[in-house]
Regions:
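Alpha-helical transmembrane segments and membrane-interface helix-loop junctions
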Residues: 1-174
Length: 174
């Protein structure tokens, strides 16, 4: 097998891996969003029906929203759902367009690296502190940054590979 065929095989395996990871992230986000709804409903029922609102429900809902958002942001990067300046890029000559799109994805990947690193630093710093309403480490607030950052780097790399190969990343929800 020649080098080009090997590269194509690795590239397609990586694309399939990223597509599955993106689908898994979407499914997990949906499950977590349902958990947010249940948590908020439990709080409302507790407050208005039983006259005793559970103290943990709001804190859990806020925590879950962070995870849903982090997963959604990462999937948005893969599926090109993030804000972009398409009109300016489309006016450029083809040779410049490719270079600019690669630079954009490198910037997004750099952001993902910084976000993941910062999240990790804060998670390790806050590991010994407990969230009073949930009795879990404060670190759980920063883990979504790590997860989203890693996913953003993986998905940005997928876009760069696709651009260099002259391909497009197909959204995972297709």
């Amino acid at each position: 097998m020649n080098m080009q065929a090997q590269a194509l095989g690795i590239s397609s395996k990586y694309t399939r891996f990223c597509a599955q990871l993106s689908k898994l992230s979407l499914m997990l986000a949906v499950v977590l969003l349902l958990a947010v709804i249940v948590s908020v409903q439990w709080q409302v029922i507790g407050r208005y029906v039983f006259n005793s609102s559970p103290t943990w429900a709001e804190a859990l809902a806020m925590l879950l929203v962070m995870y849903v958002t982090a997963l959604g942001v990462a999937v948005g990067v893969r599926d090109a759902g993030h804000i972009g300046l398409e009109s300016i890029v489309s006016l450029l000559p083809e040779s410049w367009r490719l270079k600019l799109e690669v630079v954009i994805h490198l910037c997004v990947a750099t952001f993902g690296i910084l976000m993941s690193y910062s999240g990790w630093v804060w998670a390790t710093l806050k590991w010994d502190e407990k969230k009073p309403m949930l009795s879990v480490p404060e670190s759980v607030d920063y883990i979504p940054l790590v997860i989203a950052g890693v996913l953003i780097v993986l998905f940005s790399a997928e876009h760069i590979i696709a651009l260099v190969r002259g391909e497009e990343v197909v959204p995972s929800w297709n």
